[in-house]
């Protein structure tokens, strides 16, 4: 993993947890101390867990697995979109619809419908309709884009989820756990880390904290995909060499 300094974590405020009265006792092992009614996260443990999550994401990407980034809280929306696009992951940053994983066939049909409506609009079909009908379809398309824009091109249930604030995204967590999909997540002091396959203890409210950790997971995916491409190139060269010899 690209080296992360303790200073970076401190500057990003990764160590600031929630109020002590809002804590989840299962986070006890990741808490360093209490300050002014706020739990302070043990950043040494954050580094260890981030390293584990990084290696897992890298290996999954190397195997060609697909990723879905989830973070619908205001502080996470921009980072989730930017980092998912940067590493070629799908994303949900506006609203998690119940059944996005457990009722994927229906969700996929809505995504296909959104794309079909876009094609009709771009081809000028809406312009030929009565104004009232065209306005209705435009509103419907806007709503679909808001929810499904980050899922364009998805063909099957994703292999790995990355989540900012699993407490807020509890429906996504439940669906992933039901289907046995591994989860990487930033877990603040009010979260249950036992629900997460690769928990990363950290502040899930500060934009800089979210950005720092999310960017590292995106880096891991990019590194894994780069390794996959290099291995594929080597295999092709070996096959070419074997054919020349024979």
UniProtKB/Swiss-Prot annotation:
Which BP terms from GO are recorded?
translation
Stretch forming the signal peptide: none
Molecular function terms from GO: structural constituent of ribosome
**Keyword annotations for this protein?**
Ribonucleoprotein, Ribosomal protein
Question: Does the keyword Ribonucleoprotein feature in the UniProt annotation?
Answer: yes
Task: Give the InterPro entries listed for this entry.
Answer: Ribosomal_uS2 (IPR001865), Ribosomal_uS2_bac/mit/plastid (IPR005706), Ribosomal_uS2_CS (IPR018130), Ribosomal_uS2_flav_dom_sf (IPR023591)
Q: Does the keyword Ribosomal protein apply?
A: yes
What cellular-component terms does GO give this entry?
Answer: cytosolic small ribosomal subunit
PANTHER family named in the record: 30S RIBOSOMAL PROTEIN S2 PROKARYOTIC AND ORGANELLAR (PTHR12534), SMALL RIBOSOMAL SUBUNIT PROTEIN US2M (PTHR12534:SF0)
Q: Which family does it belong to?
A: Belongs to the universal ribosomal protein uS2 family.
Protein name, UniProt field: Small ribosomal subunit protein uS2
User: Source organism lineage?
Assistant: Bacteria, Pseudomonadati, Dictyoglomota, Dictyoglomia, Dictyoglomales
């Amino acid at each position: 993993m690209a080296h992360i300094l303790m200073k970076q974590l401190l500057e990003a405020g990764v160590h600031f947890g929630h109020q002590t009265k809002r804590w989840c006792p299962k986070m006890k092992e990741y808490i360093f101390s209490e300050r002014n009614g706020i739990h302070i996260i043990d950043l040494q443990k954050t580094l260890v867990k981030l390293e584990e999550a990084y290696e897992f994401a890298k290996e999954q990407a190397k195997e060609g697995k697909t990723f879905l980034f989830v973070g619908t809280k205001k502080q996470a929306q921009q980072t989730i979109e930017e980092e998912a696009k940067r590493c070629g992951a799908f994303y949900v940053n506006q609203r998690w619809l119940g059944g996005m994983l457990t009722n994927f066939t229906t969700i996929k049909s809505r995504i296909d419908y959104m794309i079909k409506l876009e094609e009709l609009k771009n081809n000028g079909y809406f312009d030929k309709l009565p104004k009232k009908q065209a306005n209705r379809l435009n509103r419907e398309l806007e709503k679909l884009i808001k929810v499904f824009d980050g899922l364009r091109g998805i063909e099957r249930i994703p292999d790995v989820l990355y989540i900012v604030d699993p407490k807020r995204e509890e429906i996504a967590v439940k669906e992933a756990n039901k289907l046995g999909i591994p989860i990487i997540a930033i877990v603040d002091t009010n979260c249950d880390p036992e629900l997460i396959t690769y928990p990363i203890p950290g502040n899930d409210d500060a934009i800089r904290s979210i950005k720092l950790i999310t960017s590292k997971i995106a880096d891991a995916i990019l590194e894994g995909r780069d390794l996959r491409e290099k291995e594929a190139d080597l295999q092709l060269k070996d096959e070419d060499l074997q054919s020349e010899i024979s």
